[in-house]
Swiss-Prot record:
Protein name: Uridylate kinase
UniProt pathway: Pyrimidine metabolism; CTP biosynthesis via de novo pathway; UDP from UMP (UMPK route): step 1/1
InterPro entries hit by this protein: AceGlu_kinase-like_sf (IPR036393), Asp/Glu/Uridylate_kinase (IPR001048), Uridylate_kinase (IPR011817), Uridylate_kinase_bac (IPR015963)
Locations listed in the record: Cytoplasm
Signal peptide bounds: none
Region spans: Involved in allosteric activation by GTP: 24-29
GO cellular component, one term: cytoplasm
E.C. numbers: 2.7.4.22
Activation and inhibition: Allosterically activated by GTP. Inhibited by UTP.
Organism lineage string: Bacteria, Thermotogati, Deinococcota, Deinococci, Deinococcales
């Protein structure tokens, strides 16, 4: 039987965001208004807590290697996508700092004019000082998704959990709830449940790393007002995935 997390359990979290969250109604590019609203939600959730927050953001609003990179060298297409994540990190940093929250971007691909190089201990120090750390540039190597980067960075910085943010999907279902009105939502699962049932949570490399290291995952709808704040307080939101307790 799984043990559900208790309130105030989370001290340090890794929030995984889709780059498409920044696109707004256009579905592509960066909408300053949408990005500002996302920043507001994140900052509002942190207010009044001592939770340390790191963020990994994808680049799908700017580039998708499988679609945009057809005919290209696969590694080159992936590197273009990684550069896109730094662009998104800069947009999110700008929105968060405009709202008064100190942030730092750390990139696995060196570009010192816009981001600090990723150094694990420096990232942890920023978090201890109350800064939000946004990781860009993937993990610096092609052929890995930002899901895998999220898991890797979470383990490196000692995060308690990976929060997989979704839009209009409030957890993990046994089938696509947008296509099947009778789809069942899970409150909690084990990592092995996700593997055996082939549930779409994150890519296999990222999920295996979470399972091997016992890193919990919470899948939730970040655009449902108050969800992130409730999560950071330890309340039940979305679907919890963890090792068998």
């Amino acid at each position: 039987m799984l043990k559900r997390r208790e309130p105030d359990m989370f001290k340090r979290v890794l929030l995984k965001l889709s780059g498409e969250f920044l696109a707004g109604d256009n579905g592509f590019g960066i909408s300053p208004e949408t990005t500002a609203e996302l920043a507001r939600r994140i900052i509002g959730a942190l207010d009044g807590t001592e939770v340390e927050l790191a963020v990994v953001i994808g680049g799908g609003n700017l580039w998708r290697g499988a679609r945009n990179g057809q005919g290209m060298d696969p590694a080159t297409a992936d590197y273009i996508g990684m550069l896109g994540t730094v662009m998104n990190a800069m947009a999110l940093q700008d929105a968060m700092e405009a709202a008064g929250k100190p942030t730092r971007i750390m990139s696995a691909i060196h570009m010192q004019q816009v981001a600090e190089p990723y150094i694990r201990r420096r990232a942890m120090r920023h978090l201890e000082k109350g800064r939000v750390v946004i990781f860009g540039g993937g993990n610096g190597a092609p052929f890995f998704t930002t899901d895998t980067t999220s898991t890797l960075r979470a383990l490196e910085i000692g995060a308690d959990v990976v929060l997989m943010a979704k839009n209009a999907v409030d957890g993990v279902y046994d089938s696509d709830p947008r296509k099947n009105p009778d789809a069942k939502r899970y409150e909690q699962l084990t990592h092995m449940d996700v593997v055996e049932q082939r549930l779409e949570v994150m890519d296999a490399t990222a999920l295996t790393l979470c399972m091997d290291k016992g890193l919990p995952i919470v899948v939730f709808d970040i655009f449902e007002e108050g969800n992130l704040a409730r999560l950071l307080r330890g309340e039940r939101v979305g679907t919890l995935i963890q090792s068998r307790g």
